[in-house]
């Protein structure tokens, strides 16, 4: 077993604190509308320029292993806040730094670390309750625009395009961010259900100009297996031919004589048909087929439930107003489903989202809801250079997560004002003993730190701004972009309550662990400098 280095008590805490401050000092310069940029070196290609706190945090790895342990723990704060709310990473880091610095001073002065932690937790729990009570619903387009703009570092164009996307696809809709080709941002909305599977043969193409298959008012056959024999398909093909309508077949795969016969029928004009592979893999494929069945009022022909393809009837086929198939995608518009059937299916998937802990599964389930709800928006980012493109894409991603968080839990006054006001309201909060009271004071002082840092980054004196804001009414705050004071809600400076809440909770969690740390152990690094 490798030799270990061990540090105890104050020696351990000082090393850890040095790492915390190194990382936090690099991250906090990005906070607020006048936050500075950080340039990150890459092992290949051009360096990237960012104002995204979590990107800066992830880039930092320290040489000293004890210092690095402190830095990595604060990095965890930024990552956790980013995972839950998608934004607020810099705020979380600033809060954690303030809590750890003040907390360790109190420990050095002889306070009981466990009581300090209990005091911090008590203050944070009370602050979260007040934050939830303070939150206002965010549902109108202007509020969403303002939240998006603030999160994207006061870029109104980004706020506008996100609000427009949300208006078009709804709160359950999927909004994806891609790199565009031009200089300006573009928004495109895909109506209906789209999935990433194209036609199985170019002979199905009906529109030679666009190179797409376009089927009007088609029947849709859904099969949960591979189809190779034409014998299985004949009854359905004959029924569709009699009805003089086109047919889309979605199956695990179609090949051999089945595919060849469909192509021949197409070329001769007997039955206008097209075939695509079912989207997804494994259990996800079955779920997606069921979604398409609900959307088109059809039935999945599956031997698992005793349905055979040879005995399929025309009543088991789904239908839609239009289907467009390119070489890469299939889009179903105007499925024949009743609204109530889609609502029930969406409700079922929402329950699955509540019960799953995997962020990957949640994302996939959310995409299924969006496809059923008929909303997928794509924001294409325009920029002059690749470096600018990466920086802008990071900001749009942050803004998108912030607006989702705002719609979910509401909005509060931005610019660090909400936490500063809450700290003032909790000034009389008391713990069970004097050490807990110190912990409460540490937490309340730390809650002012984001506002102070925003003011410092804007070139103002943090303490002066904090005192002025505390003296004002509920929404009175400081607009760092203009240097003016006023009503933050009216000025459109808003923060999602979820972002502020998660930043505070994760910062307090890690700070509590660090304050109560008494020993640090790491692998011993042999000194090779004297070796020849």
Swiss-Prot record:
GO terms for biological process: protein refolding. It is found in: Cytoplasm. It comes from the Bacteria. Its main location: cytoplasm. Together with its co-chaperonin GroES, plays an essential role in assisting protein folding. The GroEL-GroES system forms a nano-cage that allows encapsulation of the non-native substrate proteins and provides a physical environment optimized to promote and accelerate protein folding. Its EC number is 5.6.1.7. One of its GO terms (cellular component) is cytoplasm. This is Chaperonin GroEL 2. It holds the Pfam family Cpn60_TCP1. It is an enzyme of class 5 (isomerase). One of its GO terms (molecular function) is ATP binding. It comes from Vibrio vulnificus (strain YJ016). Forms a cylinder of 14 subunits composed of two heptameric rings stacked back-to-back. Interacts with the co-chaperonin GroES. It catalyses: ATP + H2O + a folded polypeptide = ADP + phosphate + an unfolded polypeptide. Keywords: ATP-binding, Chaperone, Cytoplasm, Isomerase, Nucleotide-binding. Belongs to the chaperonin (HSP60) family. ATP binds at residues 30-33, 51, 87-91, 415, 479-481, 495.
């Amino acid at each position: 077993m490798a030799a270990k280095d061990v540090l105890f008590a104050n020696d351990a805490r000082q090393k850890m604190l040095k790492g915390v401050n190194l990382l936090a000092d690099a991250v906090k310069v990005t906070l607020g509308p006048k936050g500075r940029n950080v340039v990150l070196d890459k092992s290949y290609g051009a360096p990237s320029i960012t104002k995204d706190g979590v990107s800066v945090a992830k880039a930092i790895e320290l040489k000293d292993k004890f210092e690095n342990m402190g830095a990595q723990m604060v990095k965890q704060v930024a990552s956790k806040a980013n995972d839950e709310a998608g934004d607020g990473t810099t705020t979380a880091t600033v809060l954690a730094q303030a809590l750890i610095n003040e907390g360790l001073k109190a420990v050095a002065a002889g306070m009981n670390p466990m009581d300090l932690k209990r005091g911090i937790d008590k203050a944070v729990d009370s602050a979260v309750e007040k934050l939830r009570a303070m939150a206002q619903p965010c549902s109108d387009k202007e509020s969403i625009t303002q939240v998006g703009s603030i999160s994207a570092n006061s870029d109104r164009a980004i706020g506008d395009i996100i609000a427009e996307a949300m208006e078009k696809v709804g709160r359950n809709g999927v909004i994806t961010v891609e790199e565009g080709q031009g200089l300006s941002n573009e928004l495109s909305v895909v109506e209906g259900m789209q999935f990433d599977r194209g036609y199985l043969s170019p002979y199905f193409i009906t529109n030679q100009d666009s190179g797409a298959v376009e089927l009007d008012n088609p029947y849709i056959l859904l099969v949960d297996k591979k189809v190779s024999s034409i014998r299985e398909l004949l009854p359905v093909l004959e029924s569709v031919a009699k009805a003089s309508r086109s047919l889309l077949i979605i199956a695990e795969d179609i090949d051999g004589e089945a595919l060849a016969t469909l192509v021949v029928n197409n070329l001769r004009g007997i039955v206008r048909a097209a075939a695509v592979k079912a989207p997804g893999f494994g259990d996800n494929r079955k779920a997606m087929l069921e979604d398409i069945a609900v959307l088109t009022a059809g039935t999945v022909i599956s031997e698992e439930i005793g349905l055979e393809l040879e005995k399929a009837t025309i009543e088991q086929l789904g239908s839609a107003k239009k289907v467009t198939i390119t070489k890469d995608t299939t889009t179903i518009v105007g499925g024949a489903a009743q609204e109530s059937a889609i609502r029930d299916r969406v409700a079922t998937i929402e329950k699955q989202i509540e019960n799953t802990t995997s962020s990957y599964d949640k994302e996939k389930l959310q995409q299924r809801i969006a496809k059923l709800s008929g909303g997928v928006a794509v924001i294409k980012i325009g920029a002059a250079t690749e470096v600018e493109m990466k920086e802008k894409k990071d900001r749009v991603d942050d803004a998108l997560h912030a607006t989702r968080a705002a719609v979910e839990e509401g909005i509060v006054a931005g610019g660090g004002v909400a936490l500063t006001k809450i700290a003032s309201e909790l000034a009389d909060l008391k713990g069970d003993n004097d050490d807990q009271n110190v912990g409460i004071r540490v937490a309340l002082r730390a809650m002012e730190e984001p506002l102070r840092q925003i003011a410092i980054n804007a070139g103002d004196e943090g303490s002066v701004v904090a005192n002025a804001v505390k003296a004002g009414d509920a929404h009175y705050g400081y607009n760092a972009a203009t240097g003016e004071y006023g009503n933050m809600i009216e000025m459109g400076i808003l923060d999602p309550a979820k972002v502020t809440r998660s930043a505070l909770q994760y910062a307090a969690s890690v700070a509590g662990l660090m304050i109560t740390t008494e020993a640090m152990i790491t692998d011993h690094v042999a000194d090779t400098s004297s070796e020849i």
